[in-house]
């Protein structure tokens, strides 16, 4: 493993993540970044717990993490990549689209999502695209491309 990747300096705590992203409870969906290459790649952890509000209605007898929240978790990891790029304007980057997102397996309370995002492109310093994947226990549960746009 590359020394720059193994350094604890390349990890981000939940407090540091709160400094990079505007999301707050109950929509802060990234607990820790375990690999961070600003402007290129991030690998993060989302611990899924039964105490999250979505499980009150999705579904009480068989709780499943909604797919849209898995995608949102991936988007937030992508946002961590983009917000650390010094040459981009500061502002609010929001979801602009998704391509080829596929859900492979259900995500349950007690699971730990490992989310990997790689920056694919930045255009006109306003639009970005990342490739995202989410795994549980080494199994792919969701993958796709996510697009972002800077809001004025």
From Swiss-Prot:
EC numbers: 4.2.1.59
Q: Which reaction does it catalyse?
A: a (3R)-hydroxyacyl-[ACP] = a (2E)-enoyl-[ACP] + H2O
At the top of the EC hierarchy, this enzyme's class is lyase
InterPro entries reported for this sequence: FabA_FabZ (IPR013114), FabZ (IPR010084), HotDog_dom_sf (IPR029069)
Q: Which domain of life is it from?
A: Bacteria
- GO MF term (any one): (3R)-hydroxyacyl-[acyl-carrier-protein] dehydratase activity
Q: Which GO terms describe its biological process?
A: fatty acid biosynthetic process; lipid A biosynthetic process
Q: Which Pfam families match?
A: FabA
CDD domains the record matches = FabZ
Name the keywords, alphabetized.
Cytoplasm, Lipid A biosynthesis, Lipid biosynthesis, Lipid metabolism, Lyase
GO cellular component terms, A-Z: cytoplasm; membrane
Compartment(s) where it occurs, according to its Swiss-Prot or TrEMBL record: Cytoplasm
Catalytic site residues? Answer: 58
Q: Keyword Nucleotide-binding on this protein?
A: no
Asked if the Swiss-Prot or TrEMBL record annotates the protein with the keyword Lipid metabolism, the reply is yes
Q: Which NCBIfam families match?
A: fabZ (TIGR01750), PRK00006.1 (NF000582)
Instruction: Identify its protein family.
Output: Belongs to the thioester dehydratase family. FabZ subfamily.
Protein role: Involved in unsaturated fatty acids biosynthesis. Catalyzes the dehydration of short chain beta-hydroxyacyl-ACPs and long chain saturated and unsaturated beta-hydroxyacyl-ACPs.
The protein's name in its UniProt record? 3-hydroxyacyl-[acyl-carrier-protein] dehydratase FabZ
| Species name | Prochlorococcus marinus (strain MIT 9312)
Gene name tied to this protein? fabZ
């Amino acid at each position: 493993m590359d020394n720059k990747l193994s350094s604890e300096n390349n990890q981000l705590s939940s407090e540091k993540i709160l400094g990079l992203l505007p999301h707050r409870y109950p929509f802060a969906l990234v607990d820790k970044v375990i690999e961070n290459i600003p402007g290129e790649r991030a690998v993060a952890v989302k611990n899924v717990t039964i105490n999250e509000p979505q499980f009150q209605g999705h579904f009480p007898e068989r709780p499943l993490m909604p797919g849209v929240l898995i995608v949102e978790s991936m988007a937030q990891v992508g946002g961590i990549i983009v917000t650390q790029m010094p040459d981009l304007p500061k502002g609010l980057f929001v979801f602009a689209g998704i391509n080829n997102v596929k859900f492979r397996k259900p995500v349950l309370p007690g699971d730990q999502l490992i989310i990997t995002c790689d920056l694919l492109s930045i255009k006109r310093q306003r639009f970005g695209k990342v490739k995202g994947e989410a795994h549980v226990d080494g199994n792919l549960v969701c993958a796709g491309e996510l697009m972002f746009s800077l809001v004025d």
